[in-house]
Amino acid sequence: MTDKIRTVQGRVISDKMDKSFTIAIERKVKHPLLGKFIRRTTKLHVHDENNEARLGDWVEIKECRPVSKTKSWTLVRVVEKATIA
């Protein structure tokens, strides 16, 4: 049986935890009555073994077995580093 592993990309919104961070994934959904496209955000907790991701980074994550009560995703790679102004 070949299950495709889900991977998604999002922006790091919090990196204050040790070996963990939170990302926000944005998607656009159509409003049922107005027909206008609105943005919806999903927040996920991600396991980061080496503390690679920083606040504002664009990262790719994949689904894995539960690491803790809230973490079922792990870091694949940092797609784009955040620019510090």
From Swiss-Prot:
SUPFAM superfamilies hit by this protein: Nucleic acid-binding proteins
GO BP terms: translation
Entry-linked Pfam families: Ribosomal_S17
Any one GO molecular-function label of the UniProt entry: rRNA binding
Matches recorded under InterPro entries: NA-bd_OB-fold, Ribosomal_uS17, Ribosomal_uS17_bact/chlr, Ribosomal_uS17_CS
GO cellular component term of the entry, any: cytosolic small ribosomal subunit
Keywords: Ribonucleoprotein, Ribosomal protein, RNA-binding, rRNA-binding
Matches recorded under PROSITE patterns: RIBOSOMAL_S17
Subunit structure: Part of the 30S ribosomal subunit.
Family as reported in the entry's similarity comment: Belongs to the universal ribosomal protein uS17 family.
Free-text function comment from the UniProt entry: One of the primary rRNA binding proteins, it binds specifically to the 5'-end of 16S ribosomal RNA.
PANTHER family: 40S RIBOSOMAL PROTEIN S11 FAMILY MEMBER, SMALL RIBOSOMAL SUBUNIT PROTEIN US17M
Protein name: Small ribosomal subunit protein uS17
Protein's gene: rpsQ
